[in-house]
Structures are given as C-alpha cells and as structure tokens.
Amino acid sequence: MNRLLICALMTVALSAASSAVNAAKIERIVTPGGIEIWHVHDNMLPMISLEFGFVGGASQDPADKPGVANLVASLLDEGAGDLDARAFQERLEERAINISFSAQRDSLRGSLKTLVDHHDQAFDLLRLAVNAPRFDSSEVERVRAGVLAGLRRRTTNPGDIAGDRWFARAFPDHPYGRPVQGTLETVARIGIDDLRAFHRNTIARSNLKVATIGAIDAQEIAAFVDRVFAALPQEPQLVSVPEVVPQGGGEQEIVDLDVPQTVIAFGGIGLKRSDPDFIPAYVLNHILGGGSFSSRLYREVREKRGLAYSVYSYLAPYDRAGLFMGGVSTRNDRAAESLAIILDQIKKIAEAGPTAEELAKAKSYLIGSFPLRFDTSGKIAGQLLEIQLENLGIDYIDRRNGLIEAVTADDVRRAAARFLANARLLVTLVGRPDPVPNPAPATAGRG
C-alpha cells in the first residue's frame, strides 16, 4: 500500500457534505492537555485528516531575513527525532502517510492525512516533526538549494514579480511587504540558529488551532492530538505585528521585462474578515471580478474585447490589514486599454452599485456553490481550520448562507462606498506596456 491509495481515497466525494458538516455535527473537544479541536466523526472512508495552524507565520521572520518561516516549513518533515530525512520519508511512504507544512503571512500550517490502520504511526511521526525537527546541515543545504532555485525562477516570472513588487511598495517597513519565500540574498544568509529560533518562538499551544475529520471518535482524537502537541510550550514568543493600510495609492510602477505580455497587479484598502461589511463586500466583489465567467471585469475585458484570458479581483483579509486586489495579463500594446477598462468598471460599480439581477444571481451562485468547499474530507478539515483562524465561530457553516441571502442592495452600496468609491489604487505593471497607461485616477481605488 502506498500514497497512491491515500490520494485515491481522498478524492472520493463526500455526498451531502454541506448538510453533514454543520454545527450540530462539529464536535468542540478540549483535550486533557487543554488543546481545542473541532472534530467531525465520519466513517465513510477509513481515513483521518488533520489540519492545524500556528498563528504567526512569515510575519515573524527577522526583518533582515525574510524566508525563515518558509524554510522551516520546508524542513519540518526532513528528519526529526532519531530519524534522519531518508528514514523519516521512508516511514511515511511505507504507510501511505502524508505530512506537509506551509508558511503564510499570518500562520504556519500543517496537514496530516492517513489511513486509519496507520494512524498510530502517523501521529508519532507528526509529533516528531512538530516537536523535534533535526535541521541537519546537509538537509538544510539541500532544501535551501531547492528554495533558491525556485526564487531564481520567480525573478523571471512576470506574475511573481508583480505580486512581490506590489506588496513591497504597499507595505514598506512592515512584515507584509517582505516576500514569504524570502529573496536570493536573504535565504542564502539564513542559518540553522535562525530556524531553531523561529521554531522555538512560534510553535506553541496557545496560538494553535486544530481541525480533524475521519473514522475516529472524540476520545481517541483527543489523545492523539495531545500526543502531538501537548509537550509544546504554552505561550509563543511572537513579535508584535502592527495594524497597517497599504501605501502608494494612485501610484504606478512599471517593471521592465522583455516579455510579450504585461502582467498588471492592482490593489488598495479592502475590509478585514471581522468587519460587519465584509460579507456585502464579498458579494459585491463577486459581481465585479470574483465570479470568473459572470463578472463585469470578465465580460468587459475578455468577452467583449478579447483583451485577456483571465481578469479578476478579490478580497484579501489578512490579520493586520484588509486588501482589495486584482490582476490581468494582456498584450503589451493592450495593457493601457485593459487597465483603463478595469478602473472604469470599478468606478461604475462604486457609483451605481450592481443591478438587482446581478445581486440576485451572485447570491444564488455563492449559496449554491458553498457545498463544493466540503466535498472531500481534506477540504472539510481545511475549512474548519480557516474558520477558526478567522474567529468566525463554530456555527459559521450554519450561518454563512443566511448571511449571504440577507445582503441587500443598500448593504452592497454601503460596502462599495467604504473601499471603492473615491479611492485610489496602487498599480504594478511587469512587461513592456506601450503605450504606457495613465496613473490610476482618484476615483478608482484607495491606497
């Protein structure tokens, strides 16, 4: 039995997932060690999925060494305890166990997927990875080389360049302005002491969120979660990350790159997830640029004029900042036209709001598509973790569609007035746009 089996099982859809995963069936468990778990007991597959996150993430990187969190995440399963990297990976492979870690701006996250028959060994391996990563010098250098190779590729990828440059200009002197992956220079300077310090300061019990689903009861999962996490320090030693708003509103940066298309990234102030107007703003953005084939941006940029294959906007609610962002990739000689259309559509929806038909269709789609977020056990655990990290409450799944349905035209107009009307965007273009677009007007996005 190998990882192909676990992958096959994980892709089996869970029928009636959204109705099965509701607040009545999500158990809130507090382990003997004091760790809170949101658990769904499900016997449909002989599987257990666990998702967890530590609040902190890349925002905890030293200011002069971005990339530490990402390198730590890449190394946690590369040898732990008395198992070197090869032995650790062999144990995973032999038992079809999948363990992975990732770093984001506001959290360090991990995932475990295992067959029930191997859950004892799986949780033991996860315990070692979380508590006793080796950070052997040979593995650090091997993984570092892979990260550096990826960073070299990013230096020639227009989309990556646009995103990194946008964040750097929007958040100077703030952790959000530093790339999660680091840079070629900073990753080369990260030492093993930096990795150990990040692990020691960030991974603790009080900033831990855990979500599980599978063929295991509450008492068993509590014991296994304690086995993994109970020996961690109670409190992390986190660096305070200040609230921030994106800078550079109305500014435009062109990064010269010899490519046939220009990639445009734009953004400004949005709303944080805790904001009462976030749901109306979410519905509004779906109409503007979040609804793929149904959005105004898609219709005007792609469908009517054929300027781009993809154009989009989205809300990005970070812990310390709420953002409204978007992007498009188009021919160099059509970049100015594409950007002008995007800004014009933002202006129009900010001033007049959506039509009644647009609002009704958006709400219907957002409600009807919600079950797709829960059609595998991995997705369910991931959603439960996300809800915890965003402090939405254990009953959010039950409440969410009602919140969407309750959005009125007045709600949407109010949200638009807060983050789109009389606003200014920071725009980054990567390529060789000709003609050069005019800077974003004052009515198109706020920075």
Name each region found by the language model.
Residues I26, E51-V116, T156, P179, ...:
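M16/MPP (pitrilysin/insulinase) zinc-metallopeptidase core fold and M16-derived inactive scaffolds
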Residues G146-R165, G248-T262, R299-A308, D319, ...:
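Short acidic/His-enriched helical or mixed secondary-structure segments at domain edges of catalytic enzymes
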Residues N22-I29, F88, G150, A168-L208, ...:
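Histidine-acidic residue clusters that define the catalytic metal-binding segment
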Residues A58, A265-I269, G289-T330:
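A structural supersecondary motif
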Residues G81, A87-F198, F266, A360-G378, ...:
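Acidic/histidine-enriched segments that form metal/cofactor-coordinating
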Residues E78-D82, K113-R144, G291-S292, Y312-R373, ...:
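M16/insulysin-pitrilysin zinc metalloprotease superfamily fold
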Residues A168, K209-T212, V328, A360-G447:
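C-terminal regions of mature proteins
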Residues P172, Y176, V180, A204-R205, ...:
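An aromatic/glycine/proline-enriched structural segment found at the starts
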